[in-house]
Curated annotation (Swiss-Prot):
Keywords recorded for this protein, A-Z: Nucleus
Predominant cellular place of this UniProt entry's protein: nucleus
Organism: Vanderwaltozyma polyspora (strain ATCC 22028 / DSM 70294 / BCRC 21397 / CBS 2163 / NBRC 10782 / NRRL Y-8283 / UCD 57-17) (Kluyveromyces polysporus)
Cellular location(s): Nucleus
Protein name listed in UniProt: Type 1 phosphatases regulator YPI2
Annotated Basic residues bias: 54-65
Length: 97
């Protein structure tokens, strides 16, 4: 029951400077240079603010969804039609009685 509580740097930031915690020498708001952006993002998005990047990302998503509406749904998205099977079962049932 005597578990030591640990503070995780990227989640918890102490309010008092004299508290021991994470020595934050990194920036949470900036993306590291080594991480590559997704292939759908253009190079121009790097210089834009959060809201503008989000706006462009949403627009790309909407455009992609709009372009994909012509494609046929996959097998998991199509509800099977059992009406013929039901008719056969009803006929079989009525013939047996």
């Amino acid at each position: 029951m005597n578990k030591k509580k640990t503070k995780i740097c990227c989640i918890y930031h102490p309010q008092d400077e004299d508290e021991e915690g994470c020595t934050s020498d990194h920036q949470h708001d900036e993306l590291p240079e080594s991480s590559s952006s997704s292939s759908s993002e253009s190079e121009n998005d790097k210089d834009l603010g959060f809201d503008e990047r989000r706006k462009r990302r949403v627009e790309r998503r909407r455009r992609k969804l709009r372009d994909n509406t012509d494609s046929a749904p996959n097998a998991y998205e199509v509800q099977p039609d059992y009406s013929e099977h039901r008719k056969k079962m009803m006929e079989k049932k009525s013939n047996n009685t």
